[in-house]
């Protein structure tokens, strides 16, 4: 997944609709993104085009252990539920966002139903210096936590992302693959290289 930074912001049409946290929406609006809309956890927004629609539901996420999480901006995961007609069964894609493994994730399949695939933000992001220091604050799932999330959410297919963009990542993609393999789940991993596409 891309990170919101000055480069990404410069390249975006200011009229593009953005669904985000209630914390981020007013900040984006002040930067000229008038269509930014903040939603609370478990709220959703639906966008339709003809008979097709996608419903985006805000899901629980936490960027750091309590009480440190209060010092960081809130994060959210997203359930994307795609339908092509009133009769078609919805297809659900879970996007974790930059969260740790938290108990609230267990509510997701209960509230949202069976999930078809997931995109997990991994990397074991550790501030301030990744693996360069023997200590730090971990703010995203590492390979082991990602594997646990796959099991708890019942994800039949999973695409790991967000693991090698910056020097603060402490858990490469191979950590996740090794952890999934150790639990007999290697066949669920979809390795997606930059610039490539995959059909799920």
Predicted regions and their residues:
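Generic recognition of short, well-ordered alpha-helical segments
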Residues: 7, 31, 170-174
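Metabolite-binding pocket within alpha/beta catalytic cores that recognizes anionic/polar moieties
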Residues: 8, 15, 32-35
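Core dinuclear metal-dependent hydrolase active-site scaffold
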Residues: 39-113, 194-200
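Short active-site oxyanion
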Residues: 12-18, 91-93
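Di-metal (Zn2+ and/or Mg2+/Mn2+) metal-binding site signature of metallo-dependent hydrolases
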Residues: 1-13, 22-27, 105
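Cap/insert and terminal regions of metallo-dependent hydrolase folds
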Residues: 17, 23-26, 100-194
